[in-house]
């Protein structure tokens, strides 16, 4: 997989999960290894040593001198921002010396290419977006499994892609389909990755400190597409639709959109409402005698279809709550259909999927008030999606480390849906200033527990108390899961006080 390079020397930068996976993979293939981390003793160093991987370890600041001694490939961990001055200087030096700089995704793409020479030709599906990646990735994996395929789910979702591939090789159980969740960090170093189909779910402000600008962040997301990839795009998101080919372009026929309105183009997906029922639908050519003819006509572009809305299933048959999750379901269905999986088992699987923890998860209903854990909502876009998706009166709990985001997109959904907003954490004042114009009652609380109890007092039957912070958690908690645990404990206390059970 390393071309003409024989036992190349690889410099791995960063010893997180991906860095360790790169080191394992390279050691497996006989590479000489130098591993560098800004920490003198990163946690995974012990694992590296315990596994007997022969590598030179260098702790401390990155410098171009790390390239000396014959380095041929740099393996870059996704957590390291290429804008950080020391790393930027090292990458510039690598480029000057024509040293390849790969992330784990590029190693994975090269590995699949090498395996392809032995006849292994799996389908590869990839998902990115600011929000909804994990839900859509797991759902897509389930859909493929229920269609009878052997499936591997990996990437940002964990396990690392290279670790999962190594395990599949060792077990002689290579999957038919790879379903990959990919972050902008992982895509930043993509070079030859070309999945069969890939979806961008949405693009809103996030990780701007890492990428430097929104445009750079969006551009990284766009690297998910190869030259022949079927593009699955959210037509409700203008930033996503910038990746749609121009009408009449050669690859326009390989573009599928999904959204929360009725689809107008053949092969697209959306929602159709009839007598108060929302249906997941596909736009089909009414005149096409079969699906093969329909696809051929779309590819040729010579036929103007008479569009009809083919009902797939009622949206409320999904077990995952919210309109944003209906959109995620449409994206997963579109990806699976893009590799020609039959519709019937996919629709059964859509009804089966129960969702992910801490992602608009209803954890209790007390006195007809839903308590919803969306602690994974660590950016503004996620909270907007949760508010609009639940589409009911809400007492919102928000705040934490805002990561320099603009909170203005919260104004409209808060004004529409919120009975009140409870604010916590470092950036509560910034959120308060932004939401003041809504006229919605705002209250500051020193702890999440206090915010939950106050929200419970304000909520009325039929409402939801929603923890969707729009912020990272590290100013008050170990991580978003710890924040969710504190929320759940407070809800349990409320249930006990009211004589209910959760």
Curated annotation (Swiss-Prot):
Q: Cite the PANTHER family for this sequence.
A: UDP-N-ACETYLMURAMOYLALANINE--D-GLUTAMATE LIGASE
Q: What class of enzyme is it?
A: ligase
Listed GO molecular functions?
ATP binding; UDP-N-acetylmuramoylalanine-D-glutamate ligase activity
**What is a single cellular component term in the Gene Ontology annotation?**
cytoplasm
Pathway(s) where this gene product acts: Cell wall biogenesis; peptidoglycan biosynthesis
Put simply, this protein is called UDP-N-acetylmuramoylalanine--D-glutamate ligase
Kindly state which reaction or reactions the protein catalyses: UDP-N-acetyl-alpha-D-muramoyl-L-alanine + D-glutamate + ATP = UDP-N-acetyl-alpha-D-muramoyl-L-alanyl-D-glutamate + ADP + phosphate + H(+)
Similarity comment: family membership: Belongs to the MurCDEF family.
- InterPro entries associated with the record: Mur-like_cat_sf, Mur_ligase_C, Mur_ligase_C_dom_sf, Mur_ligase_cen, MurD
User: Which positions in this protein are listed as binding ATP?
Assistant: 129-135
Report the locations given in the UniProt record.
Answer: Cytoplasm
| Annotated EC | 6.3.2.9
Query: What residue ranges carry the coiled-coil annotation?
Result: none
């Amino acid at each position: 997989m390393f071309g003409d390079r024989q036992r190349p020397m690889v410099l791995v930068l960063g010893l997180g999960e991906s860095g360790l996976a790169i080191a394992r993979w390279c050691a497996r293939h006989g590479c000489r290894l130098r591993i560098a981390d800004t920490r003198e003793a990163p946690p995974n160093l012990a694992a590296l040593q315990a596994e007997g991987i022969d590598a030179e370890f260098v702790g401390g600041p990155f410098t171009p001198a790390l390239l000396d001694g014959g380095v041929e490939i740099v393996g870059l961990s996704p957590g390291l921002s290429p804008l950080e001055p020391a790393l930027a200087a090292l990458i510039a030096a690598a480029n000057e010396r024509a040293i390849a700089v790969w992330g784990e995704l590029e190693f994975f793409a090269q590995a699949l290419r090498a395996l392809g020479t032995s006849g292994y030709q799996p389908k590869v599906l990839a998902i990115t977006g600011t929000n909804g990646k994990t839900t859509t990735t797991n759902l897509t994996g389930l859909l493929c499994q229920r269609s009878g395929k052997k499936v591997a789910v990996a990437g940002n979702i964990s396990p690392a892609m290279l670790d999962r591939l190594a395990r599949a090789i060792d077990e002689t159980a290579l999957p038919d389909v790879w379903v990959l969740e990919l972050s902008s960090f992982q895509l930043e170093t993509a070079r030859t990755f070309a999945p069969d189909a890939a979806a961008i779910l949405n693009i809103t402000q996030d990780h701007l400190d890492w990428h430097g600008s929104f445009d750079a962040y969006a551009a990284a997301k766009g690297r998910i597409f190869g030259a022949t990839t079927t593009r699955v795009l959210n037509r409700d998101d203008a930033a996503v639709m910038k990746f749609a080919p121009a009408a009449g372009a050669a690859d326009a026929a390989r573009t599928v959109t999904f959204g929360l309105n009725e689809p107008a183009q053949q092969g697209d997906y959306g929602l159709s409402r009839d007598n108060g029922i929302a249906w997941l639908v596909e736009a089909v050519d009414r005149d096409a005698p079969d699906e093969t003819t329909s696809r051929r006509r779309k590819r040729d572009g010579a036929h103007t279809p008479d569009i009809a809305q083919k009902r797939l299933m009622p949206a409320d048959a999904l077990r995952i709550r919210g309109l944003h999750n209906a959109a995620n379901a449409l994206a997963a269905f579109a990806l699976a259909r893009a590799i020609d999986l039959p519709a019937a088992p996919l629709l059964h699987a859509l009804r089966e999927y129960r969702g992910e923890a801490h992602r608009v998860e209803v954890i209790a209903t007390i006195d007809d008030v839903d308590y919803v854990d969306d602690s994974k909502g660590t950016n503004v876009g996620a909270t907007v999606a949760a508010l609009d998706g639940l589409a009911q009166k809400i007492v919102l709990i928000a705040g934490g480390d805002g990561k320099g985001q603009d909170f203005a997109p919260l104004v409209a959904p808060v004004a529409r849906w919120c009975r009140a907003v409870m604010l916590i954490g470092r950036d509560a004042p910034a959120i308060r200033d932004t939401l003041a114009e809504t006229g919605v009652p705002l209250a500051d609380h020193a702890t999440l527990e206090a915010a939950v109890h106050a929200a419970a007092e304000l909520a009325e039957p039929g409402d939801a108390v929603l923890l969707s912070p729009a912020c990272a958690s590290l100013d008050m908690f170990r991580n978003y899961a710890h924040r969710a645990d504190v929320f759940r404990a407070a809800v349990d206390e409320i249930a006990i006080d009211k004589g209910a059970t959760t």
